[in-house]
């Protein structure tokens, strides 16, 4: 095996998906602790202050105490290199989260044992399903009262449409939580709470049918054995092929706060989750062990460092090897660049990088020329597929306070839209500018950044737009006919694409019925 192939085989790149408050931040901390990336878990604190977690860079995040940005963290574990992409928990930032999921090979789904499957989890699983992403599941908070575990598995299967295969099974919960039983290994992992950075070596009891197990379970023993028979009769067994194809999820139980069960999940990622996979480009499929470097940008983060008005483009390496000072081609601009200052991440602690391999995430300094979806190669003209723009759910008309600054306003909105969290639309029939976003908070972010970075003050007005759909049609004549009839509701988006701004849900349904040859798409790819 070549050195490059060996490095690729070591990589595991995954994201954590969950509903806000299911315990994602705590799990992230415990995972980093396993890789010794932080010495004291129980809070990813900034090294310079105790007030803010390291991943909260932007002023607005600090003021509101939510993670708006996607953090990327790399750490070693069991002779592997783990790339963990943390996704924003706040509901307004789903588009950023969705695109992050295009850069990973697997995902860890965290569920609150007391609440089960929640709306955000469903939305994120829908995105994972588009790419058949393998999912490992962790049912968290067993140190509290949880719902019946069998009921939770049924809910995963019914709501998320994926088979659930329990690997561990909880022995009691809350004050009676005694640990988990490993179904295939026939052993008990005893629960001893470890808080903060304590990692207590787990005590193992071999075989459920043993005096030691009977003593540990006490009067719960008989009912637990009965429950297990039911579970083993009713549940799916783990199957590696079904897992890799996104049809089955192995399920683990534990408590991240009590530092119990998180290592089982990380072991599953190392043992079962795929190494970096081939990536589909418009031209061909790119394999990770190819010699030549390729990568695509899935996220742009502006102003990670307020001292320099910088933007960092986050790139997933798809093949080859990044070496400091190498030359790469920015395919969309057909321009060669020498990259000597790519970054690796521990949240906002950034370090310059000497080398990186397929599966790794690196940061490129971006002075406004890099866009989401851009491909970089060593010369080949490639464009990776599957990096989506989603139709916004909220719309506002932008009103300029100083009419003389309309040029700066357009420029600012266009540049901020390039980061992919908001989208800008220019109606065909008016001089209005309409801003679309997936959450209300984004409008505040844009207004404050226009003011700080572009010296433009704007206000928002309500507008009757229910949703946007990108328009395409194979029949040119039909498209022209549609454009003439629907002109009132048509706009051009920031990327120059024709868009239908539907005033109501009913209007959209009627238009889709009336114009069967026109495709009304809720997503479009970045090009």
Swiss-Prot record:
It comes from Pseudomonas entomophila (strain L48). Belongs to the TRAFAC class translation factor GTPase superfamily. Classic translation factor GTPase family. PrfC subfamily. Its main location: cytoplasm. Residues 9-277 form the tr-type G domain. PANTHER family: PEPTIDE CHAIN RELEASE FACTOR RF3. GTP binds at residues 18-25, 86-90, 140-143. It comes from the Bacteria. It is found in: Cytoplasm. Keywords: Cytoplasm, GTP-binding, Nucleotide-binding, Protein biosynthesis. GO terms for biological process: regulation of translational termination. GO terms for molecular function: GTP binding; GTPase activity; guanosine tetraphosphate binding; translation release factor activity, codon nonspecific; translation release factor activity, codon specific. CDD domains: RF3 (cd04169), RF3_II (cd03689), RF3_III (cd16259). Increases the formation of ribosomal termination complexes and stimulates activities of RF-1 and RF-2. It binds guanine nucleotides and has strong preference for UGA stop codons. It may interact directly with the ribosome. The stimulation of RF-1 and RF-2 is significantly reduced by GTP and GDP, but not by GMP. One of its GO terms (cellular component) is cytosol. This is Peptide chain release factor 3. InterPro entries: EF-G-like_DII, EFG_III/V, G_TR_CS, P-loop_NTPase, PrfC, RF3_C, RF3_dom_3_sf, RF3_GTP-bd.
């Amino acid at each position: 095996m070549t050195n490059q192939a060996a490095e690729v085989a070591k990589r595991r790149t995954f994201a954590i998906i969950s509903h806000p408050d299911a315990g994602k931040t705590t799990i992230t901390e415990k995972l980093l602790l396993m890789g010794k990336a932080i010495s004291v878990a129980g809070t990813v604190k900034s090294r310079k202050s105790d007030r803010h977690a390291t991943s909260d860079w932007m002023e607005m995040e600090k003021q509101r105490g939510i993670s708006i940005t996607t953090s990327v963290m790399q750490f070693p574990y069991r002779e592997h290199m783990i790339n963990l992409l943390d996704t924003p928990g706040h509901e307004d930032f789903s588009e950023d989260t969705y695109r992050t999921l295009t850069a990973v090979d697997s995902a860890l789904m965290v569920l609150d044992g007391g609440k089960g499957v929640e709306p955000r989890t469903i939305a994120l699983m829908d995105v994972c399903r588009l790419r058949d992403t393998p999912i490992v599941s962790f049912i968290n908070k067993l140190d509290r009262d949880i719902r019946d575990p069998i009921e939770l598995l049924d809910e995963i299967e019914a709501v998320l449409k994926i088979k659930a295969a329990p690997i561990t099974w909880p022995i009691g919960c809350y004050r009676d939580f005694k640990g988990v039983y490993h179904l295939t290994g026939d052993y008990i992992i005893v629960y001893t709470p470890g808080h903060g950075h304590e990692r207590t070596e787990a005590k193992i009891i071999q075989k459920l049918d043993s005096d030691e197990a009977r003593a540990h379970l006490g009067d719960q023993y008989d009912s637990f054995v009965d429950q297990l028979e039911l579970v083993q009769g009713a549940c799916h067994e783990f199957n590696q092929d079904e897992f890799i194809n996104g049809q089955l999820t192995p399920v683990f139980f534990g408590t991240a706060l009590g530092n119990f069960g998180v290592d089982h999940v990380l072991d599953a990622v190392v043992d079962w989750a795929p190494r970096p996979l081939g990536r589909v480009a418009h031209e061909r499929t790119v394999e990770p062990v190819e010699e030549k470097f390729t990568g695509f940008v899935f996220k742009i983060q502006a102003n990670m460092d307020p001292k320099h008005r910088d933007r960092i483009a986050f790139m997933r390496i798809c093949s080859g090897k990044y070496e400091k000072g190498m030359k790469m081609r920015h395919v969309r601009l057909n321009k060669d660049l020498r990259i000597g200052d790519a970054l690796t991440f521990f949240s906002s602690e950034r370090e310059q990088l000497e080398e990186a391999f397929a599966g790794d995430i690196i940061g490129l300094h971006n002075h406004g020329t890099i866009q989401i979806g851009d491909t970089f190669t060593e010369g080949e003209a490639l464009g990776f597929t599957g990096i989506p723009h989603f139709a916004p759910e909220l719309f506002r008309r932008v009103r300029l306070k100083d009419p003389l600054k309309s040029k700066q306003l357009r420029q600012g909105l266009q540049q901020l839209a390039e980061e992919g969290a908001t989208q800008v639309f220019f109606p065909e029939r008016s001089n209005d500018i309409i801003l679309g976003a997936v959450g209300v908070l984004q409008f505040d972010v844009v207004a404050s950044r226009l003011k700080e970075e572009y010296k433009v003050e704007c206000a928002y007005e309500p507008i009757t737009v229910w949703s946007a759909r990108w328009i395409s049609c194979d029949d040119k004549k039909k498209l022209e006919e549609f454009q003439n009839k629907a002109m009132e509701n048509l706009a051009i988006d920031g990327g120059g694409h024709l868009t239908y701004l539907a005033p109501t849900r009913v209007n959209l349904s009627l238009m889709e019925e009336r114009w069967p040859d026109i495709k009304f798409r809720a997503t479009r790819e970045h090009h």
